[in-house]
């Protein structure tokens, strides 16, 4: 691996070591103590950088309850995105989605569907997200996948694809079931994916109420009414086995945080603890994007190609979360996986690592990727590059 770590070498190699912002007097990074959280498990994650700011028992497998509906919403959102279903499609409600006829649904949150009802996908989707309707989950699952079992297969397939390694779904709605579990960390990752992958689906999560069949029901996420935070989602979950769960997301300026609280003892506690986490995160941290998605971080020599240089960057991974007030002390260097870059190169190909440092300490690493395709050059050009590369290896940068 070829590493560019000093300022002088970096300038010779094409700005390999960069002051991302104007340097200031050294300010020692202060350790920010996380708040105590009254719950079985919890986590606070930055959306853009993926940085975990605080956590407690974040990998303990617990019952997600209606947080399961975040995945239900994700699957529906993906089906809409792929045009497999449309919001205007009319769904015929089956007997399995009838709370009166399905013992598993009695006493749970429902949309009050009846067998034979014709309900649009749009209304059922709002019934899942806003009203937490277990009957709506069943009706949508039957329509999207043909059965609840097939839909659960889709849920677990997406869980695997998203890297939710400690999550298994057994129901489409989240009512207690043997073998159904998730973790605070996995739920934060799922929430992040919902926002990023299906933003139109996520937008429904901020709606405060929904009326169906003349029955108005409020969104169960009371943080949507918070005067202290700009919360725009996501989902509550409550069962006897799970306790009181909440995934919440809020924004402040360009920064978005995701909090997860699992197994709180009361409804009030889950909201208070979530608000505490989000407020703490915004108070002590900030997220910056020193390398924009389409921006070039460094230009590097490439051999045997149809061009002599290639632009390298971070793609969508250029955001970092740092303690507030430390922005001007942020620097970055890069390391190439191989000593030389040789064509062909494909856009998005990983060729090294970007290392972000704060006050001389490495804090985050990101893939260094190719920003444009580089095809192989012609025969004579490749022969010439071979000769020049050998001279470069023998005599240094005079022949580059």
From Swiss-Prot:
Molecular function GO terms recorded: carboxypeptidase activity; penicillin binding; protein homodimerization activity; serine-type D-Ala-D-Ala carboxypeptidase activity
Functional note: Removes C-terminal D-alanyl residues from sugar-peptide cell wall precursors.
Keywords on record: Carboxypeptidase, Cell inner membrane, Cell membrane, Cell shape, Cell wall biogenesis/degradation, Hydrolase, Membrane, Peptidoglycan synthesis, Protease, Signal
Subcellular location field: Cell inner membrane
Recorded name of the encoding gene: dacC
Name of the protein in its database record: D-alanyl-D-alanine carboxypeptidase DacC
Pathway(s) served: Cell wall biogenesis; peptidoglycan biosynthesis
Gene3D superfamilies given in the database record: D-Ala-D-Ala carboxypeptidase, C-terminal domain (2.60.410.10), DD-peptidase/beta-lactamase superfamily (3.40.710.10)
E.C. code: 3.4.16.4
Source organism of the structure: Escherichia coli (strain K12)
Catalytic reaction(s) noted: Preferential cleavage: (Ac)2-L-Lys-D-Ala-|-D-Ala. Also transpeptidation of peptidyl-alanyl moieties that are N-acyl substituents of D-alanine
PANTHER family reported in the protein's UniProt record: D-ALANYL-D-ALANINE CARBOXYPEPTIDASE, TRAFFICKING PROTEIN PARTICLE COMPLEX SUBUNIT 12
Cellular component terms (Gene Ontology): outer membrane-bounded periplasmic space; plasma membrane
Membrane topology term: Peripheral membrane protein
Residues involved in substrate binding: 235
Superkingdom of this protein's organism: Bacteria
InterPro entries on file: Beta-lactam/transpept-like (IPR012338), Peniciliin-bd_prot_C_sf (IPR015956), Peptidase_S11 (IPR018044), Peptidase_S11_C (IPR012907), Peptidase_S11_C_sf (IPR037167), Peptidase_S11_N (IPR001967)
Signal peptide bounds: 1-27
């Amino acid at each position: 691996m070829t590493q560019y770590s000093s300022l002088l070498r970096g300038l010779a190699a094409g700005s390999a070591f960069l002051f991302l912002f104007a340097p200031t007097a050294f300010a020692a990074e202060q350790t920010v103590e996380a708040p105590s959280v009254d719950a079985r498990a919890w986590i606070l994650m930055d959306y853009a950088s993926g940085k975990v700011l605080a956590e407690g028992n974040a990998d303990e497998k617990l019952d997600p309850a209606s947080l399961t509906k975040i995945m239900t919403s994700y699957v529906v959102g993906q089906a809409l995105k792929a045009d497999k279903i449309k919001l205007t499609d009319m769904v015929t409600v089956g007997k399995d989605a009838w709370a009166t006829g399905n013992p598993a649904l009695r006493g749970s949150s429902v949309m009050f569907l009846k067998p034979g009802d014709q309900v649009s996908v749009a209304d059922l989707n709002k019934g899942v997200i806003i009203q937490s309707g277990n009957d709506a989950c069943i009706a949508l699952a039957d329509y999207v996948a043909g059965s609840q079992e097939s839909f659960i297969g889709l849920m677990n397939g997406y869980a695997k694809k998203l890297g939710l390694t400690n999550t298994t779904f057994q129901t489409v709605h989240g009512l207690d079931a043997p073998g159904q579990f998730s973790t605070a960390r996995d739920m934060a990752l799922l929430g992040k994916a919902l926002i990023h992958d299906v933003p139109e689906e996520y937008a429904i999560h901020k709606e405060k109420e929904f009326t169906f069949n003349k029955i108005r029901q409020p969104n169960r996420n009371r943080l949507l009414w918070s005067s202290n935070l700009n919360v725009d989602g996501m989902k509550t979950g409550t069962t006897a086995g799970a306790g009181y769960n909440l995934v919440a997301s809020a924004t402040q300026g360009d920064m978005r945080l995701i909090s997860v609280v699992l197994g709180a003892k009361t409804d009030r506690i889950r909201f208070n603890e979530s608000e505490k986490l989000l407020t703490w995160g915004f108070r002590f941290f900030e997220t910056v994007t020193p390398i924009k998605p389409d921006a070039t971080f460094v230009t590097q020599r490439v051999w045997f190609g149809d061009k002599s240089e290639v632009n390298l960057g971070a793609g969508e991974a250029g955001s970092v979360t740092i303690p507030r007030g430390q922005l001007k002390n942020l620097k970055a260097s890069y390391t190439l996986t191989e000593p030389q870059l040789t064509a062909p190169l494909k856009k998005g190909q990983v060729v090294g690592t970007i290392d972000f440092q704060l006050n001389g300490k490495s804090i985050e690493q990101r893939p260094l990727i190719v920003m444009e395709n580089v095809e192989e050059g012609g025969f004579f050009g490749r022969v010439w590059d071979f000769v020049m590369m050998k001279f470069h290896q023998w005599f240094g940068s005079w022949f580059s």
